[in-house]
């Protein structure tokens, strides 16, 4: 069976719960959501650079890092992957342009 985002989310949850000095996940969470968001931003930039450089292997590696840090950020704010999936499922009921137009503006 393939490794999924749910598997990764479960790993993040387990490491957040057990922690310990050896847990990178726990260290990120202990530094707070702002730090987790900053790390996600760094990984996003690295992913973009890999894509622009057309380096397939580097892009895959950076995307893996990006997904991990996204799940850590979600965990830091108490948002689950299932909740994000529910939003995505709801958006599938209309076209992309309709969905974008329906979003509330700040």
Where are the model-predicted features located?
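Flexible "arm" and connector segments at domain edges
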Residues: 1-63, 67-106
């Amino acid at each position: 069976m393939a490794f999924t985002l749910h598997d990764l989310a479960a790993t993040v949850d387990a490491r957040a719960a057990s922690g310990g000095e050896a847990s990178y996940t726990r260290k990120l969470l202990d530094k707070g959501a702002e730090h987790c968001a900053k790390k996600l931003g760094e990984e996003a930039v690295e992913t973009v650079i890999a894509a622009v450089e057309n380096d397939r292997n580097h892009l895959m590696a950076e995307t893996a890092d990006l997904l991990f840090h996204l799940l850590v950020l979600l965990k830091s704010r108490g948002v689950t992957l299932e909740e994000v999936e529910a939003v995505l499922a709801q958006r599938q009921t209309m076209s992309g342009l309709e969905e974008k137009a329906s979003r509330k503006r700040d």
